[in-house]
């Protein structure tokens, strides 16, 4: 789930201004926001989907780039979910049919406490480009629904003093740790249930 684990942890630790140590010293039973995010990241990394059904196949999202200094093969191994329209023109094999099914259920569970599901239908199957756009749309919708249903609101980026990461909110999905701007998609796994339903799970980078 993480592109830059070391950088992520470094930003968190630098952003806490020493408050993590104070919190732990004052109450050993209370976890700081930083510790909670790290714990949730680890849980997300370890999550398995074998109980969903049989894994049929997987596919990747790669975006062509001229930045061969950072990406030697000329491809960024993920696509942007915040502004997919920017990556779409250079998305590798964007028009390839990657799911040969007329209906799929897509599960979004990162960075969510309670997962979000939606159904897509298409008589011709689904392409990479189509899935990138649709998944981005649903991320925007669920983030909006979270904000509307939460009593603990998202702290604006310019007002985050102890931690740069998004605070956890208590809306319908319990979003934690990341704004949409942090999120990219690097791959999708295709599962088939016992009753023939096709379910897609997402490999989201942050």
Q: Predicted segment positions?
A:
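Composition-driven low-complexity segments enriched in polar/acidic and proline residues
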Residues: 23-118
């Amino acid at each position: 789930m993480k592109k830059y684990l070391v950088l992520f942890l470094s930003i968190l630790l630098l952003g806490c201004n020493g408050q993590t140590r104070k919190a732990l010293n004052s109450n050993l039973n209370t976890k700081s926001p930083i510790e909670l995010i790290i714990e949730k990241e680890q849980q997300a990394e370890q999550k398995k989907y074998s109980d969903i059904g049989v894994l049929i196949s997987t596919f990747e999202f790669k975006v062509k780039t001229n930045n061969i200094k950072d990406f030697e093969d000329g491809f960024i191994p993920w696509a942007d979910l915040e502004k997919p329209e920017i990556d779409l023109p250079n998305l590798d094999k964007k028009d390839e049919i990657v799911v040969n099914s007329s209906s799929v259920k897509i599960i979004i569970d990162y960075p969510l406490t309670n997962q979000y599901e939606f159904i897509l239908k298409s008589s011709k199957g689904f392409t990479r480009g189509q899935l990138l756009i649709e998944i981005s749309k649903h991320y925007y919708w669920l983030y909006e629904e979270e904000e509307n249903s939460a009593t603990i609101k998202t702290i604006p980026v310019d007002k985050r003093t102890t931690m740069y990461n998004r605070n956890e909110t208590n809306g319908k999905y319990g979003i934690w740790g990341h704004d949409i701007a942090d999120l990219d998609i690097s791959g999708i796994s295709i599962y088939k249930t016992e009753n023939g339903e096709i379910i897609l799970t997402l490999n989201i980078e942050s």
